[in-house]
Design a protein with these regions (language model features):
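N-terminal (or domain-start) structured segment
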Residues: 79-170, 209-211, 217, 233-262, ...
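Hinge/capping helix and adjacent helix->loop/strand transition within the periplasmic-binding protein
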Residues: 138-143, 151, 159-246, 295-307
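N-terminal secretory signal peptides
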Residues: 3-12, 16-54, 61-72
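Sec/Tat signal peptide C-region and signal peptidase I cleavage site
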Residues: 73-79
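C-terminal lobe and pocket-closing loops
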Residues: 194, 266-307
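Short secondary-structure boundary segments
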Residues: 150-151, 189, 263-264, 282-283
């Protein structure tokens, strides 16, 4: 899951966020309900290389409400300025080229058109998204810095790292959910297996020899691989990267054997024949690749994972 957040500081829990509460976007860490009201989700369609933002207008309405609220922040000069009066940044906690980056750039294009200001994408990769999260959390809560968070940065990392550099609940206010994305198990075509059963047999005959890349420790593709290890009773070796793009580059060069990655990041390479699609991690097949089986139906019953 990818979602759009804005930094939230204790001193700024009134003002720009008052209107957000009225629209149902919650302020975590306050006495208000911490449950986000349902928003329309993005439908990501890669076959035409376009994203149909079905929830775009609702997301923009939330951002517009944020803009309206900025007028009551302390400071007469700031109160008189129309929002947005300068470019807006979207911090992406992974390198350019991955799904989180793709989504941020698509959202940024729409925001720039609707709000009349440039939207700049800042890629701050590393530590499973924690570097970008810390960077965004320290930004001013003035509506000019947004954060494209993921299930990893806002949930999983808190269980994996002894000390988080930011509080994923108290330091951010959620604006809208952006997308749910399936993961795809892909292999370099030079690998000797083409199906899940063949890969399992090869992995059991060669423990630790199959290495799999991921966008970083704790990212959902990493956990997809570890879940496969546990359920298939094999030993795949994890190699973390600072984002999806460098991992895919090494996969294309056969420096790593396989990868569990978000569908949008790898499907162009599957369609060009540069990567081999083995299985999809969700419970149902993807309409984008209807001939590619799920991992569950291909030999690991009960397996299901997504980003």
């Amino acid at each position: 899951v990818s979602a759009l957040f804005t930094p939230l500081h204790r001193a700024a829990r009134t003002g720009p966020f008052t209107r957000l509460l009225r629209l149902g976007a919650c302020l975590p860490g306050t006495a208000d309900s911490i449950e986000l009201r349902k928003t329309e989700e993005t439908t990501l369609t890669t076959s035409t290389h376009r994203t149909f933002l079905t929830g775009r207008r609702k997301a923009l309405a939330v951002l517009a409400s944020l803009a309206a609220g900025t007028a009551v922040l302390p400071g007469a000069a700031f109160a008189q300025a129309a929002y947005p009066a300068k470019p807006i940044s979207i911090v992406v906690p992974f390198s350019a080229g991955g799904t989180t980056d793709i989504l941020a750039r698509l959202v940024g294009q729409y925001l720039s058109t609707e709000l009349g200001q440039p939207v700049v994408i800042e890629n701050k990769a590393g530590a499973g998204g924690n570097i970008g999260g810390q960077y965004a959390a320290k930004a001013a809560a003035d509506g000019y810095t947004l954060f494209m968070g993921t299930v990893g940065t806002q949930s999983i990392n808190a269980s994996l790292y002894k000390k988080m550099p930011f509080d994923p609940i108290k330091d951010f206010a959620p604006l809208t959910r952006v997308a749910n994305v399936p993961n795809l198990l892909v292999a370099n075509p030079q690998q000797p297996f083409k199906t899940v059963p063949e890969m399992i047999a090869y992995a059991k005959a060669n423990p630790g020899k199959i290495n799999f890349g991921s966008p970083g420790n704790g990212a959902s593709p990493h956990l997809s691989g570890e879940l496969f290890n546990a359920m298939a009773k094999v030993e795949l070796t994890h190699i973390p990267y600072k984002g999806s793009a460098p991992a895919v580059t090494d996969l294309l060069g056969n420096q790593i054997a396989i990868m569990f990655d978000n569908l949008p990041s790898v499907i162009p390479h599957v369609r060009s024949g540069k990567l081999r699609a083995i299985a999809i991690t969700t419970a149902k097949r993807s309409p984008e690749l209807p001939d590619v089986p799920t991992i569950a139906e291909a030999g690991v019953p009960g397996y299901e994972a997504m980003s």
